[in-house]
């Protein structure tokens, strides 16, 4: 196929070379390691691997494909299905179908293994060379190419249709990482993993590889998704894969998976398992991302179609032809020693990148920018990566989308694009280097590099350039690597590298010890390749940084476009917003795929770091074309590699730990980190925000990794820091310096972990680098190559950066060791002197907050401005000081930290420095190691405290240039640390104690009168008396008899032989944290003898002062510590107390004897409860104590008597001692006693009778009285009733009267009425009688 279908992966050639290593690399899994193992196994591949006898032999063997050494026919159906599932292939069908399917996949994998990266870009041509015997594969590849072309055309059409929709959706996805941080870990990892796929540039192979591992876990769901994503990837990747149906792609992926599976099985390291998990997650996420990418790719494909049609996605064969040419050319260049060519190619690439960037910048429309970038990057990548056109096309489009911001950032940042391209390519190339070292396949390496870089169009272009440049580097390295290639081929080296890779990821989890073990192996393997590893580490650093920086730039471009990107960035962000939406989702997926890559890169990172070192060394060696460009590209590639390593570390964490939020924060941080890189133009606060999430995430991840590889990686990180600051350091430093106040604490942690986003990038780069650097730096101490690059980087950075940025880098460096406190001690143990470098340089990047250490510690360092001079001075210092320099840096940071904590706690930070005890440092490392570890811990704890004094940090920054000051301080601290060293040097007893962590610069003035008795309160367990006394004995000679500590070890009274010792102890211990887990700060104050005597039980009453205080005077803030005894206010009380003291002294001694006897069987906790209980219960402590003292005296007397008795206790003794009345032990009564008792009983009975009678009489009387009362009550009731009856009668009478009156009134009224009626009648009759006679008369008349 094209480079085995992986050509599409920028690791296509790498995929071929690495046998899916590209995929593996893309998947960011241990694939690199897996394929490295394979590559190592593979003999040096001639420029045409196809001609490789082993390849042809293996290809011939493809007919007899074996899985894990077993013929497919011999495998069970379940095994076949599992293998198919791993490869994401269909598991349905008869066994013969399964065997066929798996065979095809394995053959493809073998092809990928053996296809030469530099061979003609056409897989067919390669196959013709490699597999002229295998006509099946030829047909297969031809078919795939045809299908890929058709699909690409189709997808280009679809992409054109979906472009707008996807652009809109991608606009929403503009900050996929930012979003990713908000998304569930799966989504985040999926987002990252698509990027990983892109970065793998074997979208499918990476997915298929990740699917190999992932399918087994999430095979079924992921399969479909992967297949859909693979279909998309295949469409994009079928240009590179030779247009093959999804199954064919799966088959191809299956080979890659088989390769990976085999390599994994060969390596079968935990890393691989972790990587597999990560890949599974990546695959899951890639599937989602692939779908997203498909939509993104659709527009990208559309654009790519527009541009890629111009480059007709450069027919795979043409692209392959171009690539083979490019690769063969690159290989030739590499063989020539490519550095000179590198600079030329870098110039060309920078010109191309600049032209592309200018085009992009000129092109306001995202599509135009994307198209131009895609065209240029596709042209470059298709020429150099034609094997990976499909995904490369998509990747290029996405990368171009991403690269638009990246290029814009790189344009703004200057030639970084070229170097970024180169650098971005170098990460693959470094892998190739490692691969080439493993298998001096220099030619393939460029192709692989190119293929790996596709995720970023700029990265693609850069990878083309870088691949060429890398080819040159590889050429330069190839001579070096060729010998070491053989060594690398040697399983030992394979194991170290591969193991280092897994370990890097695992150590990301915290397998420091494993990494130490592997680091030695890496060192061993690295030692065979010291120069190469370093160079490779440099190349890888550059490459990864370039890759990371493109992704960072993408992210930065996204953020910057969203934040304060310049007009170019804004245009690009506008253009890129759609393209970034696609490309940011894709680039987020890329960067995430990079992060898987970075995990893969981490697995490869040792090699990469070495290659970075090589690239850096070359960058420094070729400062002409590279110093600034190289440094920038290195910083870019490192930032990218950091983002990868961050996302990778986060991915590995995700897969390894539920720290998905870290990943999201990591991916988000990555997004922010790029912003920081591009936010050089953006506001510093965004950087702070960026830095904090990143650095915290990356700090955790990078702290782990950085701790593993912190030493070498620190150097690389410093280079990266310098290089990266070139991009964003001027503004970043300014921004961060401006930011520190606002985000001082957050950034301090970040700055401590990585003073800047750069430092965090550095951390991540360091993670990758550290992984490499564990090998590389181990070699470095020999070669010190990274160190010169660091000065060069510093120079470049100094050119590009303001001094503040340099100081920030110094902070990073100095804080880097802090970041890796634990790592440092680990490194110190494993690496010794190199540990110094990593401590100084890498210690900080991955530094995790120690238990009990303030989080602010890590956050506040960014405020320190590191000047270029200071960086230069620090770097040279670090080089000579290896161990101490780390100490110096740590101490510089420590001083800052202590200052911060001092501001916070108001306590003496210097003491912390001196007092901080590094449990980690328990191992007897050179003073440097101990001091470093201790300082690291101190720093951790001081950092929270020292963080507040960000301004002092600035002064410290100023001091950083003269690290000697910090060294002096730190060394002094180191001395104190050594003095405090975990082993009691005085006693010779190896008591491991933590050095107290100074919280304040200067202890607050004592409350009590200075005396030789020191009262230390706020003690919090866990610690042992021996540890406490060891701590106290550091500053003076304890009077053992006068030492008192309460039962719960919350406070103690220490009596020193002299007041000076007491003063020294208070100065050393006041306001420090000890043990480190103590959430409180120790309060050391002077106490009076009375106070001590009282607590020792010699005084019944508290000192009068204490009493008065208890009565009304507020006691000091430390209630446990009695207020420093002042001369008793009342002489009488004093006398009384003295008498009591004398009495209680004796009583106390007796009590102590009793206690010792009693408490032998008592548990400490119970004893504490028993003794402390009464105090806590009673309100009046004085009363309680007095009573207790008395009761204790009595008890002690009784107990003493009991003690006098023979040990064999008689029943009588036991009985007499019992307080209860045990019936069992009543002795029989004598007759007299019986008589007496009988008489007593009779008397008692009589008395009882009398009492009964009396009681009865009384009761009778009572009853009579009660009856009397009852009678009276009855009478009363009767009387009341009578009264009430009388009243009722009277009322009735009255009512009757009233009724009679009423009746009478009525009668009267009636009578009157009748009378009226009568009168009226009479009147009428009279009037009639009168009138009638008149009539009669008249009538008569």
UniProtKB/Swiss-Prot annotation:
Q: Which UniProt keywords apply?
A: Acetylation, Apoptosis, Isopeptide bond, Methylation, mRNA processing, mRNA splicing, Nucleus, Phosphoprotein, RNA-binding, Ubl conjugation
Biased region (Polar residues) positions are: 662-679, 744-756, 854-865
Bias (Pro residues) ranges: 1116-1130
- State where composition is biased (Acidic residues): 161-171, 270-290, 936-946
Q: Domain SAP spans what residues?
A: 72-106
Spell out the Pfam families in the cross-references.
Answer: RSB_motif, SAP
Query: Positions modified as N6-acetyllysine?
Result: 717, 861
Region span, Sufficient for interaction with RNPS1 and SAP18 and formation of the ASAP complex: 1210-1237
Phosphotyrosine PTM positions: 512
Q: Give residue spans, biased composition: Basic residues.
A: 1176-1193
Query: Ranges of Basic and acidic residues compositional bias?
Result: 219-228, 291-349, 372-385, 486-497, 514-524, 548-559, 714-735, 757-767, 798-815, 892-915, 1098-1112, 1131-1175, 1194-1216, 1237-1320
Instruction: Say what the protein does.
Output: Auxiliary component of the splicing-dependent multiprotein exon junction complex (EJC) deposited at splice junction on mRNAs. The EJC is a dynamic structure consisting of core proteins and several peripheral nuclear and cytoplasmic associated factors that join the complex only transiently either during EJC assembly or during subsequent mRNA metabolism.
Kindly state the subunit structure of this protein.
Found in a mRNA splicing-dependent exon junction complex (EJC). Component of the heterotrimeric ASAP (apoptosis- and splicing-associated protein) complexes consisting of RNPS1, SAP18 and different isoforms of ACIN1; the association of SAP18 seems to require a preformed RNPS1:ACIN1 complex. Interacts with API5. Interacts with SRPK2 in a phosphorylation-dependent manner.
Name of the protein: Apoptotic chromatin condensation inducer in the nucleus
The top of its lineage is: Eukaryota, Metazoa, Chordata, Craniata, Vertebrata
